[in-house]
Amino acid sequence: MTSQATKSVAPDTENRGKPLSRAAHRTQVVPAAEASRVSETTYRRVRADIVYGRLAPGQKLTLERMRGAYGSAVSTLREIFNGLASEGLITAEGARGFEVAAISADDLREIAAMRQLLECDALRSSFESGDVEWEGRVVAAHHKLATLEKRMSAGDRSQEEAMRRYDWAFHNALISACGSRLLLDMHAQLYDKYLRYLMLASVFRGEPVTVEHRELRDFALERDWRSAQAVTVTHIQDCVAQMVSGDLWQR
C-alpha cells in the first residue's frame, strides 16, 4: 500500500532532558500515541476498503454510519476522509458530505498512462542499479505471484485479493532499485488507483499475463530494461483494453 507520512510532534525544547513523571507520561504521551495509532489503523482500513472495492464507487460515506463500521470518532473519520479526498479516492461534497470517488474509462486511461510512464522510467534505473539482493527480491516476489496466478488460471478465484497484492509486490520489486523514493511513493499511490479498477472489473487475462510476468522476471535478471519496458507497455495497455471493453461501466 502507499507510504503515508506520519504526524510529528514538535520537540519540547523547554523541558528537554527533564524526566516526565510516570503519571505525566501516562496522561500526556500514551493517549497521543494511541490516538495516532488508531487513526493510522482506521485510515489504512478505509483506504483498503476503497481500493479493494468493498466500498463501491459513488457510495455515500455518512459519518455517523461509518463511525459504527470503523469504531472511530466522527472527527477522526472526517480527517481521514479529507485526506483520502486529496488523494482522489473520496469526493468531498461540501454540506452533502463524502462519497467514494466515481470511476470512468477516461480516468482509468489517465491512471494507466501515468503508471506506464513512471514504471518504464523506473525500470531503466532499477535494472542498471540493482544488486544481487534486488535480484533475490524480484525472484521471490515473482514466485509468490506465479503460485496464485496458477490457481487463478485453474478457476480458483478465492485468493484474488492476495494475488493482487502479490502482483503489486512484484512490480514494486522490479523498480525498487531505481534510487528515487519520491518516484516509488508516487508509483505506489498511483498503483492503488489502478488496482481499484482491477478489483472492480475482476479482470484476469490468464496465460498472457502469466507469460508477461515471467518475461519481466527474466529480463530483470538479464538487465534488459528495453525489453522489460516493451513488455510493461503491452502488459498495461492490454489489461486496460479488457477493462474498458467489459461491463464495469454498466453496473
Mark where each language-model region is:
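C-terminal regulatory/effector modules of DNA-binding transcriptional regulators
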Residues: 2-6, 69, 200-251
